[in-house]
Structures are given as structure tokens and as C-alpha cells.
Amino acid sequence: MVQLSERKNPESAVTMNKQWWKEAVVYQIYPKSFYDSNGDGIGDLKGVIQKLDYLKELGIDVIWLSPVYQSPMDDNGYDISDYQAIAEEFGSMEDMDLLIDEAKKRNIKIIMDLVVNHTSDEHEWFLASKSDVNHRKRDWYIWKDGKDDGNPPNNWESIFGGSCWEYDEQTEQYYLHAFSKKQPDLNWENPDLRNAVYKMVTWWLEKGISGFRVDAITFIKKRQDFANSDGEMNVIETNQEGIHEFLSELSKQAFASHDILTVAEAPGVSHKELPIYAGEEGHFSMLFEFDHVDLDVGKKGKWYEPHKWNLLDFKKAISDSQTFYNNTGWGALYLENHDQPRSLNKFIKPEDIGPTSAKMLATVYFLLKGTPFIYQGQEIGMTNVEYPSIEHYNDLASIDQYHSALKEGFSKEEALAAIWRRSRDNSRTPMQWNHSQYAGFSQGTPWLEINANYSSINVENALKDDNSLFYFYKNLIKLRKSSPYSEVIAFGKYEDLFEDSLQIMAYAREFNNKKIAVIANFGHKEVALNLDFTMKEVILSNYDHLELHPNQLKLRPYESIVCEIDSSF
């Protein structure tokens, strides 16, 4: 593997808005599956603390910590019963304070999930709300009378299937839940509710965290006529008119007084709307887009009816957002998270999955314009899991999709194959630390079964191999942060190359008269390229023994090259 050099002659400071998060690398931790310190089979905060030196070695700057708040765990912590307490299985508030302090000693910041579209039905706010129709917190949630015939108020459906309305016999009304019935939606129309949210956010920021990943934020505004949906799907609609008043207030009242990173999960946002969400004056620092990771999901969202796609579709999704960010705003670069399957299974043919293709895939996304996110295990090449039956799965969405497939006439084998391909449990299997029992994740039986390939794919093996994917990610991070090319990677203009190729993905980045090209072969066959530019120097590659020709390039299967090119091109 061709290595990169350390920065020797850093370029002069650029005259632009250089917020700290624009040059940071974020590592997402799903605590339940990261490292278990006490042998109960569940990852915890002390486990995260014990692995901080591993993350420091990788070179990341920020940890995004998935929910650790007090929760009944109906949806793995996204059903919060107390925003200002830690779930017992993860530890205590003292553990959280220690994590913040220990991370700070290593120059690592912590951001948390902010889940404010809904709470748990066991949150004190909801318990008060459902206790009496006249309670002052009744309007903190969305309650409606049913129809005269006894049916729910409208035909809206929840993300997890079925009606998004749940009947409460005590008060004889329905409450709204966009997700599980254990996750009632908050009523953002109520100013007292909004102020309570802002107060909670401020409390966490003053405790020392450095920002939030804002969960499902485009769900917070509902159509106030609550009319039936007449679309092909009746799933509750997102990004409704009037949402920007709420988001602007959230930013001003809770975010603006602190120098923080905010990244929004914002389904339903078009490219035209990106400036409002993530422009220089947007509501958030950046947002997660879905087009490039959901190419295989059709409009109906049925995993068992996958949408066909090819490399041109992936390239267009990337190009559309990158071209926008040339002019304004900032991107969140990612291929994996806790809601997605593993990227190697999604983007690489099964027979071609391995270190070479994994390094190619890492190169392609990591050097785009934006802040890169690495999901736990991605840096060692963890892959999807194939459990033998649906009973082995924990993910609510997987269970719903499986039974929906059976209802629509698919066989058990076909339904399970869809779950293998798309389940959120693919990314939630415990982190593979070594080849010992339970992959070194825990001394006890893990809450979710370990992937069977843990003996070959694990951290211990990766750290022993100088040519491993782990060290390749480490080099990519160095390239972004401490090389002569750091500023062109962070701030350079994006330009498509070979845009019509079905096998090659390539782009250029240019800043202050310095230009680099990223060229990757997504195929298992060698390809020869005639170049319209001159390669001056190869900066990084996933192959050894490169044959360099100034205006011609031969790429071997899944080969990727980062090179400096003539800036006059």
C-alpha cells in the first residue's frame, strides 16, 4: 500500500469560516454493542471509556454516542423515559461525566443523540399527559378523538407498521406515534413543551458535550388538519410547512450560545431545501442524506421488493449533494450507521468482499467535501450477519418487514433473505475485538448474537497487520488532518470525472491552486483509462507496486488511487 507523507509545509490560513467540525472525523458508537465492562452482555459507558485509547490510535476527533438515556428499551434507547438520567444497563451519570472528562484528556469531543420527536410512554411527561384530559401537560402530546365508527382519527401509518394512533381507554382518546406505540409523539405546537426541550438541551451542553445528532427531526411538524393521506403510502409525512419556525427557534434558543456540531437526521428534505437545513445560515451544521444509502429501497419501503440500481445511480446521488456543497453548506459523509446494513455487503459483490474492496470504498467516501463519519466496526471491515430464523432478530423494523413479506405471499426463505440484506441488526451485532469467546465483547452472553466471522475479522487481528483496513482508515484520517493536502480535502471544490462510466467512480478536489483526483475501480476486472490530466504524484493507494504513466492509468480490480494532478486541468 502506498503511504502518505506527514505535513511539512502547511499552506497559509484560508479566509473562510473554519468551524472546528469541518476538519473533524466522527466515530459513531452504538453503546449496547461496543464493549461490555461488567459481563452482563450489554455494552456500557465504562466499556467506552476502556476503549478510548483505541479510538485515539485511530485518530478520530469526535464520538457520536447513540442513546444512553433512561429508557425501557422498546426501540433500543430511542424511547426515552428520562432525558437527564442514564439507563441502568449503560451505567450512571457519574460514568457519563467520567467519559466526557476522559475523552477530553485525549482531545476527543462527545456528541449525543437528541431524540425530541417523541418520548417513551413511560416518560413522566406522558404519564402526566395521559392521566387526565385537563392536565396541563395533556397538550404536550397529540391526542385526538376517534371517528364516530370507532376507527382511529385518520389513516396515517407508523414507520414500524400499522396505524400511528393508539387508543387510551382511560381518557377515551387516541395518541399519535410516528414510530412504536411505546413512542408517543411530542406536540411541538405547544410552547411550554418546546421550552422544556430547550432547557434539557442546554443542561447537556453545559455538562460538557459538544453537540447532537438530531434524530428524526423532520417528523416534529404535523399537518394540523390531520386529514387522511391519499398517497400510495399512508406513512406519516415529514418536513411539513411550518417546520422551519420550530427549527429556527431550536437553533436560537438551545444551540446558538455554544460552539457545537449539530447533524440532523432529516428524511424528506430535497436538495433545494438543503440551504435552509445545512447552509451557512442553516438550522444545523450538517445533515445526513439518504439517497446514496437507500438506493436499494423502493418508494414503498419494502425490503422484500428491492429497487435495482447501478454505479451511475450511486454516483449521481453523491454528485448532486457534493455539487450543492460547492456553493453553500456542509455535508455529513457516511456509508454506515446503526440504521443501515454494513456497507461492504451493500456496495460490493459478495465474492469480492475483502480488504482491497473495503479500502477502495473507504477512499471514495472519505475524501469528499464534508465531515466523515465512521461507524463502529466499519474500520475493521465488519459485515452483515445471517441469523437462521427471524426469532434471532431484535430489530423492530426487521420483524415488521418479515411478517409483512409473509402476508404478501413471500416464502419464509424469501422474507428472511430480505432481512439478511437490510436488517438494522446487521450493524448492531457486537463489536468484534478478538477471536476469544463472544469476540472479546463480553464475558457473558451478548444481548445479540455475535457474527460468526469474528475469529477472522476483529480488532486484534487488524492491529497486528500493518496492511489492515484499520491502518488504511488511519492513513485516510492523517491525509485529511495533517498532510499537505488537508485543506484541499476539507475545503476544495468538487468536480465529477468519468461520470458516464459504469465501473469507475472518480472526482477531483481543488483549492488554492492545488488539485487532487480520487479514482476508484468498482469492478472485479482491470480497466485502462486515458487521462485528460497529468498525474504529478500518487498520494495514497490500496495496492502496492504502481505502474505510473502521466496520462494513462490501469486500475486493477477494486483499486483506488488518490493523486495530485495538474491544477490547470
Language-model-derived ranges and their functions:
Residues 31, 114, 216, 266, ...:
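Residues immediately flanking
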Residues 121-157, 247, 251-430, 435:
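Conserved alpha/beta catalytic core and glycan-binding cleft of carbohydrate-active enzymes
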Residues 109, 113, 211, 261, ...:
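Hydrophobic "anchor" residues on beta-strands that sit immediately upstream
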Residues 63, 212-214:
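Hydrophobic residues within beta-strands of alpha/beta enzymes
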Residues 184-190, 194, 237, 344-356, ...:
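Active-site rim elements
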Residues 2-70, 97, 101-103, 371-374, ...:
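Carbohydrate-interacting/catalytic domains
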Residues 51, 102, 200-207, 249-253, ...:
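Generic, well-ordered alpha-helical scaffold segments in large soluble proteins
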Residues 2-7, 12-202, 206, 219-281, ...:
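Acidic/aromatic-lined carbohydrate-recognition and catalytic surfaces
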